[in-house]
Amino acid sequence: MNLRPFKIDIPEREIFELKQRLSATRLPEKETVDDWSQGVPRAYLAELCSYWVDDYDWYETQGRLNRINQGLFRIEGIDIHYVEVRSNCDGAKPLLLTHGWPGSFLEFEKIIGPLTNPLEYGLDSKIACHVICPTLPGFGFSGKPIGVGWNVDRIA
């Protein structure tokens, strides 16, 4: 298997275009109820769009995520993204973490440190793991399936 290094590098143009689209969002009329029973409340959606345009720092997030070892490998014609973090602890066991739908490796970001370097978190080194977290086909930085039949059994 040919493992290739991977770094997240979203072009500035794409971030600019996303901010333009978010700024141009046509919000629906105010809902008739003050809860989520009819979907996402207009005020929440407006606040979320504003946050992504004015406050969210993609480059900080990208830098943080790039501190995690990532790579790509090709299987059945599709590039599969993965995260791999090895432990320095003797006797560490490999641990495969898989996300569900919808999801991504980000679900595991906060536990990778304690799993791979438990001593830094005041935990016993006996729980140390080498973490491998593939991104499912069609999710995140993995390629999209190019044919039919990509069901749970095939992906597993």
Give, region by region, the residue ranges found by the protein language model.
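N-terminal targeting or regulatory segments adjacent to alpha/beta-hydrolase or S9 domains
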Residues: 1-64
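Catalytic cores of eukaryotic secretory-pathway lumenal/extracellular enzymes that build
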Residues: 6, 24, 46-156
